[in-house]
Design a protein with these regions (language model features):
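Sec/Tat signal peptide C-region and signal peptidase I cleavage site
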Residues: 14-21
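Bacterial N-terminal signal peptides that target proteins for export
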Residues: 1-7
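Short helix-initiation/N-cap motifs at beta->coil->alpha
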Residues: 60-73, 152, 167
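Extracytoplasmic "Venus flytrap"
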Residues: 25-42, 62-67
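Alpha-to-beta junction loops
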Residues: 52-55, 71-85, 163-165
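Contiguous mixed-secondary-structure segments that line small-molecule binding/active-site clefts
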Residues: 45, 86-167
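A local structural motif
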Residues: 23, 45-63, 134, 156-163
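Cleavable N-terminal signal peptides
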Residues: 7-9, 19
Length: 167
């Protein structure tokens, strides 16, 4: 299961080129050393290089611009331009994104990527566009299924009779 799906989003105005030309704000909630932090820093470096320095990226890490929900709101309002966000927060805007967290949904990462790079990803992007956002890509923290303290749960059938708590 993908317990956390990170979607990189930008307001449609940045894609259209009407946002501030000098600096793009990329906000996320991760701390230094986290893969999302490292990826955001690399994105900033490459984006600045690809634009010949005409545009720079200010990475606002460690939730300095708010939690995931607040960052999505800020992106729709044009306060920030890009956010690497969570499945839970994104599902408040595109409810279908919540389905991506179901246990055993994907048999492996290649299957998950095929789905997200296909019609499902296009549908998520279209719904995000309705809220003033543009999905640039997806982030994963690996596929996770259900874990239990007493026994393994390698298949859905292993859940039979088991009591579990969910958020």
């Amino acid at each position: 299961m993908k317990t956390t799906l990170m979607a990189v989003l930008a307001t449609t105005t940045i894609i259209a080129g009407t946002a501030q030309a000098d600096e793009i704000i990329f906000a996320h909630g991760s701390n230094p050393g986290n893969p999302r932090y490292v990826a955001a820093e690399k994105f900033a470096e490459l984006f600045t290089a690809c634009t010949g320095g005409e545009h720079t990226v200010n990475v606002a890490a460690s939730a300095t611009m708010g939690d995931d929900s607040e960052m999505l709101t800020s992106a729709t309002a044009g306060v920030i331009n890009i956010t690497a966000n969570s499945q839970g927060a994104m599902s408040q805007i595109v409810p279908e994104v919540g389905l991506l967290g179901l246990p055993f949904l994907f048999k492996d990462l290649p299957t998950a990527w095929a789905v997200l790079d296909g019609e499902v990803g296009d549908m998520i992007d279209a719904r995000a566009n309705n809220a003033g956002l543009k999905v640039l890509g997806f982030w994963d923290n690996g596929i996770r299924n259900v874990t239990h303290t007493e026994k393994g749960v390698p298949t859905p059938a292993d859940l039979s009779g088991m009591q579990i708590r969910t958020p």
